[in-house]
Amino acid sequence: MSTKAIILHSGGLDSTVCLLLALEKGREVISLGIDYGQRSRAELEYALKLCKRFDVERKVLNIEWDKPKRVIPKSRSINEIGKEVSSAFLPGRNALFLVLACAEAAGIGASEVWTGINSIDYSGYPDCRPEFLEQFRKMINLAIPKGPEIIAPLISLSKPEIAKEAYRLGIRQGDTWSCYRPFNTNNGFVPCGECDACVLHKYAWEHIPKQTKVKSKMNKE
């Protein structure tokens, strides 16, 4: 009997790589999205398309969240992005999503929750750090005894390394969504190309490691 795993899946590069890694490892996968009124509705559409493509069950939790207003920076360089936490950062989002995923996992008998958080390169977000993950695991073990194991296979990978893994798994640059400020056109959503997410996405694909054989950093961190 295969292990049932919930994947926190936004439709972005990181979470989609997690989804495909879980499938590759033979997990019984459920893609879990969170509809919290995000301005980038395109990510929900992309996640659904990917689930249909890879024949994965998709579930979306709807929550009401009166989020703080944030300024989405644009046209920043890679170096600028890496210097400080972006004003686009939504405090507590990853913690909240992980709690919801763990609660969902406990309810359906899933023994794993996978998340695409990563701390290398330019994220800088406090809830993408190994220290956060370590403390969250301790907290959730108290809240849900014998609850799901939290798997974060990308925690020590750079963005280009994640893009390389995506390529290996059959994903190309336009298959996932990574934009905070999309344009809604008659032909669908179009990335702005200027926000931090777009800049990092482009950087990742343009700087994929050239080596054809590298030792994998994948783990169950």
Segment roles from a protein language model:
Residues 1-170, 216-218:
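ATP-dependent adenylation/nucleotidyltransferase module used to activate substrates
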Residues 99, 175-182, 186-203:
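Local cysteine-cluster metal-coordination motifs and their immediate loop/turn environment
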Residues 204-213:
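Short cysteine/histidine-rich zinc-coordinating motifs and their immediately flanking basic loops
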